[in-house]
Amino acid sequence: MPPLAPQLCRAVFLVPILLLLQVKPLNGSPGPKDGSQTEKTPSADQNQEQFEEHFVASSVGEMWQVVDMAQQEEDQSSKTAAVHKHSFHLSFCFSLASVMVFSGGPLRRTFPNIQLCFMLTH
């Protein structure tokens, strides 16, 4: 039977990683209860909103230019997604580093007295 300490360190290391890597199903994909994918029809309010978004115009000098509001929303959502992805990567790296530091990680072999000094002072 292997010692319990390495298994505990491995569990402490894997739990934050597994929590950070949660995978959520997409809206269009069938869930675990659904075997088939159903097509949803948009309501009249959504159709009206799409109609208004596509026919907004702006004045540029003496010329009129059609502005596609849906395209602007897609650009904004892609920028927001990039920011969220970057912040997720940053938090993942920080969590991984903190787990390695607090569990001893590679510092345990190099500096074995760090843990002893910490235990003596606290």
Curated annotation (Swiss-Prot):
UniProt-listed GO biological process terms: fusion of sperm to egg plasma membrane involved in single fertilization
Residue stretches of biased makeup (Polar residues): 38-49
InterPro entries, sorted: LLCFC1
Cross-referenced Pfam families: LLCFC1
Signal sequence residues: 1-28
Region (Disordered): 27-51
Keywords: Fertilization, Secreted, Signal
Disulfide cysteine pairs (residue numbers): none
Entry protein name: Sperm-egg fusion protein LLCFC1
Function: Sperm protein required for fusion of sperm with the egg membrane during fertilization.
Subcellular location: Secreted
Transmembrane region(s): none
Keyword match Zinc-finger: no
Gene: LLCFC1
GO cellular component: extracellular region
